[in-house]
Amino acid sequence: MKSFQLDEILGQEIALTFLKRYISKPETIPPLLIFHGPDGTGKESASERFIKNVLCFEGTSCGICASCKSFINNSHPDYIRFPEESGKIIPIGSEDNPEEFSIRWLIRSRLNYRPHLSRFRFIVFPDASLIGNEAETALLKSLEEAPPFSRFIFIVNNLDKLKETIVSRAICVPFQYLNQKDLRKINTSLGFSTLPFQGGSLISSECPKEVLDLVQEK
């Protein structure tokens, strides 16, 4: 079974400080969090762990309550994760019958309805740079008028890929390259004989993509 403990995310002390504070006081979570930083630094893994903790009835990612079981089984009704397809823009959706995982679909059929199981609903965009211009404008209005139980998480490599009007309304949670000590820990846990250490950073151009993927999964 996959573990969902935040402390398993290595080398991201600044980000974890933000997230642990919000877990202890979930009512202070802002409408929009932006997780930003290089590939392979655990942004999506951290978002999953953070959300599971907040949605948990005990606030501890207990693994036992109905919320945790639903999350583990990928069936939590209050966790909406937009699919990530390389290069495919997330559309605003048609006026009459917006397709699933379009922005109009989200606004009309999910955003303003109360959560089914937990106290909050989370909407996650694993690559927020794929949100189309028209869709981003529509989302901006929703962020300004978000119901008290809905929270957004945008994940992006570079804040410059988002509109300034979006970024200015968010709390930005930074993720950074890992130092050599943490890389060696991951190296050992994954069973690799070597990892490319360059200046204490995990640099995507010098590290195989499959290694980056494994690091992020951890």
Label for each model-derived stretch:
Residues 99, 120, 127, 131-135, ...:
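Short, well-structured alpha-helical patches and their helix-loop capping segments
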Residues 1-134:
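Clamp-loader machinery-focused feature within the broader ASCE/P-loop NTPase space
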